[in-house]
Amino acid sequence: MLFSAALCFANQISFQIVQHDDSADNVTEDSMIIEDSVLNTFFEYGYIVTNSDAAISDSENQDEHLYKIGSGEAFNGFSDYFIQIKLYYERTDNTLSASSDLYKINFTIASAKSGVKIAEKTLENLKVDRTKKNNLAKISTDLVSQINKALKANKA
């Protein structure tokens, strides 16, 4: 009998959710839903996935500080890529729910080994339909699809 072994090499990514929401003192349930969905979708795409704790930020300086922490964790955890995902929420006169509305997502992808930023993109004019149960999961799936395209373009 002949046995053959196939070795699979999956890329390891580490991501970090950074929430921008002036009306929230803690990471919101919406951000946690997105974090969970991003983690699961990357796993389904075949990546080895880790993440830093979701955090709140109110400035670009704080974003950069969190970025350095997250990219350091990715490097120390032997990840191939670090992805910072910034979620932007706002309350307007049209906000119908108790929580703020997600209106923009920005992501930055960097090599965890070299620190070189390889992609950055902003998804704007997001429409969260709170009457649909899985709307945030769909937004997350679309986000992961965009990130995956950028990773594939960089041979991930």
Task: Name each region found by the language model.
Residues 9-10, 76:
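Short intrinsically disordered, low-complexity segments
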Residues 16-18, 86-88, 126:
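A structural detector for beta-sheet-dominated domains
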Residues 17, 22-83:
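N-terminal segment of the mature soluble domain
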